[in-house]
Amino acid sequence: MFNFLKKIFNSSKKALRKARTIANKVQNLEAQIALLDDKDFATKTAELKKLFQEGKTLNQLLPEAYALAKEATKRVTGLTPYYVQILGAVILHQGNIAEMKTGEGKTLTAIMPAYLNALSGNAVHIVTVNEYLAKREFEGSIGDVFRFLGMTVGLNTKDKDQTQKQQAYLCDVLYTTNSELGFDYLRDNMEIEASNLVMKRPYSYAIVDEVDSILIDEARTPLIISQSVKETKNLYKEAQRFVRTLKNSHYLIELETKTIELTEEGITKAENFFQIDNLYNIEHASLLHHVKNALKAAFTMHKDKDYLVDYKDGQVLIIDQFTGRALPGRQFSDGLHQALEAKEGLLIKKETSIGATITYQNFFRLYQKLSGMTGTAKTEEDEFRDIYNMEVIEIPTNVPMIRIDEPDFIFVSLKEKYDALIEELTSRHKKGQPILIGTTTVEVSEIISKKLKKHSIKHEILNAKNHSKEAEIIAKAGLKNAVTIATNMAGRGTDIRLGEGVKELGGLSVLGTERHESRRIDNQLRGRAGRQGDPGYSRFFISSEDELAQRFGGTRIEKIISLLQKISDSETKTSSKMVTKFFTKIQKKVESSNFDYRKYLLKYDDILRIQREIIYNQRKEILVSDKVEQIVQDLMKKTLNKAIFTHFTNKPNKCQTQALITFLENKFFPKQTFDLEEVQELCNNPKTNSLDSFQQYSFQKVKDILQSQKDFFVKDPEKAQYFAKGLKWITLKIIDNYYQRHINDMSSLRQGIGFVSYGQQDSFIEYQKEGQVLFNNMITKIANDITATILKFSFADSFQTPPKQKVFFKNDSSDDESSKKRRTRKVRTSKKPWN
């Protein structure tokens, strides 16, 4: 282990040493670049772009490009990037993570690698955690730096229409949020008009701000485009009515994992309540699903901690557990959101199914090069390396850190802890020192707020309930006498600047109300103080009644704290390295567990990723192709050849003419397509291979039908383009129809696959095998349905106008028994699965 850590440490030092060599080359060009006139910068950019096209690499262009960007930043913003910011910029260009402490200028640092990589003509996306930050950089002086350099800059936010998004994505540099970027990707892969695509270039390079928040904290939260499903409102209400009758003996909560299940006594009670024999019978699967969601909603989900209730608009709002922000428009999936609505007595909205989905883990791995910035990534460097192939390189601060980080104060009860917190806060507030109080939940922030009101201490609250005032509150948090309560470091991404005279008072004082599951979040809170060499102070107040202690320490930690207080000089508060280490050990355990869980989920999600890429790549080829007729013909030929071959090999008499005609006309062709005498002649000709002959004959029928359909449009020049559009539209709609069903099938498979462990089988291997079977079955159905729909479709009747009306596809839900049984066999998937 020591050798492994030593190797990592040495590799980090080596990367920094190489970065210094490059940064020195940048500095050597500063005097030369400073002689340029303002108008020369855009000219220089054009020259560098030309050099790249002529064969120069970005690494070769880096020193001059960075020197230009640095001088441009100085002229436009009045701020000169420090040497350490050049180091960070080099690390970003190399596709790694630059860990830069709060206030060290990550915003300016990103300009240099963004400018350099945009010289290639490929898209550069600078990704922020919220729209406020994206707009601030685009509209402000940072965007002006790029414009000064002759680069185009775009902004991508959810209020932009399709045309605005298309223009933004064509810019050299795009400022965007992670969520909007991901949803645009999903929406693009549901488009049926190529002209509507917003991202028409490859995903080349992304710089992710607060990279740990997006790629670690939000990794488990998939982006989902939903569709309405069959209503089951009454089941939600009945399930909620049932759980309200339960006592502690009826259910069991696992605190560490926050899972809940009915006990045997609870199962019996459910069966009596719903008047059924066996809750776990397959016929009661929907009821069981609703009961489980009702249990989660009632006993593991807490208002003002996991979600907010907006009674005015009658809706449940998710609280981001890592930022404390509300997430309007987002829903808990799989019916949990509706269960919470039932719990809170709100109108139950329609449950949704998945139309398209992707996780941030898999979305950001689409980029050819990925880099990121944050003040807190070192604790998660193993995950960044394993999942994203990025190293975390600590960038030294420009000025030494002088913040004082005091040991934790520890208490037995929450009351003792809060009393001590208010005591210290009051003492510091009296001398005018600004104070930032960090909480882990909205609920705790409001408890602290009530206590401050009792002491007549004016303060601001920054949590999910008032996130709209975030920038305004943070801007004032460093002023004299300011007291700010922030949940899970809401306000991250905006510096807290000290007001006049605050340095003399000791700078910003940060008081944490408890330890978070992740050391990173604690470090983010501490990092709000002591920016750029400013003085600062931080201390955490923890108790044995804190959630982290309750989940992992139990009564053991309470006994330890009680013992320490007895031997301490203070009656209540005391500090102990042993207890601090104990909590740190818990945090490491949770972090390791969360990492393992994210890896576990990623392993499953990678199966869907491979399938999604196959579908989306083939779909896009069809969408943008101007040769869709040829694509469709090739697909039909292979589909028919396969079907005919299967029919021949399954028949004792290989060419039963009437049976063959009936089979093909039922499955693919319009009635009376085939002539019985012609088919008999083909089958009975001793000089030819009847299988090959009939395959060629049937494909000629395909070409004849397609030509007759096309002839209908050729008669009217205004409608000539509709034939190709019609083929494309039908093909894409069928792909989407089946793929969306497949996503939900895979979701159901994932939820149910855990039960195979009872049969001593590996659940992942079983998921992989059955997922491949589902995928191959879907591919076959897509090919069959495209062939049948187009051959049987009457363009003359239905395509008098462009194809905007709904086409009703063949219902393929009535599978034969063999396809209903999931089989485990090796499945091969290709880049063009149905070709």
From Swiss-Prot:
Monomer and homodimer. Part of the essential Sec protein translocation apparatus which comprises SecA, SecYEG and auxiliary proteins SecDF. Other proteins may also be involved. PROSITE patterns: SECA, SECA_MOTOR_DEAD. Residues 820-835 have a biased composition (Basic residues). Its main location: membrane. Keywords: ATP-binding, Cell membrane, Cytoplasm, Membrane, Nucleotide-binding, Protein transport, Translocase, Translocation, Transport. Belongs to the SecA family. It comes from Aster yellows witches'-broom phytoplasma (strain AYWB). One of its GO terms (cellular component) is cell envelope Sec protein transport complex. This is Protein translocase subunit SecA. The keyword Translocase applies. The keyword ATP-binding applies. Its EC number is 7.4.2.8. HAMAP family: SecA. One of its GO terms (biological process) is protein targeting. GO terms for molecular function: ATP binding; protein-exporting ATPase activity. It holds the Pfam family SecA_PP_bind. ATP binds at Q85, G103, E104, G105, K106, T107, D495. It catalyses: ATP + H2O + cellular proteinSide 1 = ADP + phosphate + cellular proteinSide 2. Residues 805-835 are annotated as: Disordered. Part of the Sec protein translocase complex. Interacts with the SecYEG preprotein conducting channel. Has a central role in coupling the hydrolysis of ATP to the transfer of proteins into and across the cell membrane, serving as an ATP-driven molecular motor driving the stepwise translocation of polypeptide chains across the membrane. It is found in: Cell membrane; Cytoplasm. It is a peripheral membrane protein. It is an enzyme of class 7 (translocase).
